[in-house]
């Protein structure tokens, strides 16, 4: 019996060094191996409606933040290409969502796409902080279904 392995990988990122390490890890591990497709995703957590004084303030914030995110995603894309991924096999994208939990938003993206592996960086929390506040990667590991999760230290 043979079956086709889904080689689509989603890397959920933010601006942290841990996220960059996750991207670099995937690049060094799989770059140059044919058949893998990688998407780098940044979820922009939409602020509460009353966070901004006006709609124009919200638009200005979104435009400026989107520019930062686009630069970050391009940097991560280049890391993957420089480590051997074909440019056509690397997708970067951001999405804005209302996120009561960032982990839930990331897992919703996995559920809506064809990615079988989710890669996240481990947040640099102490054990005490992680116990008190939890972590995105910890919640993803506990609640992910129908995908493999890699947590990069």
Model-derived features with residue positions:
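A short acidic, glycine-rich active-site loop
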Residues: 58-71
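Structural beta-alpha unit
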Residues: 1-4, 81-117, 138
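Short, well-ordered amphipathic alpha-helical segments that serve as non-catalytic structural scaffolds
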Residues: 22, 72-77
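General small-molecule cofactor/ligand-binding pocket signal
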Residues: 39-41, 91-95, 150
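Gly/Ser-rich helix-loop-strand patches that form or flank binding pockets
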Residues: 110-153
């Amino acid at each position: 019996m043979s079956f086709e392995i889904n080689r689509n990988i989603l890397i959920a990122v933010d601006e942290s060094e841990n996220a960059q390490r996750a991207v670099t890890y995937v690049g060094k591990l799989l770059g140059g191996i044919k058949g893998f497709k990688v998407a780098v995703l940044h979820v922009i957590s939409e602020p509460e409606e009353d966070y901004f004084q006006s709609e124009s303030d919200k638009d200005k914030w979104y435009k400026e933040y989107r520019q930062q995110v686009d630069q970050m995603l391009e940097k991560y894309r280049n890391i993957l290409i420089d480590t051997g991924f074909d440019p056509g096999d690397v997708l970067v994208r951001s999405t804005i969502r209302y996120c009561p939990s960032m982990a839930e938003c990331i897992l919703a993206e996995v559920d809506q796409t064809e990615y079988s592996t989710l890669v996240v960086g481990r947040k640099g929390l102490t054990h005490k902080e992680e116990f008190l506040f939890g972590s995105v990667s910890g919640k993803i590991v506990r609640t992910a279904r129908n995908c493999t999760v890699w947590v990069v230290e």
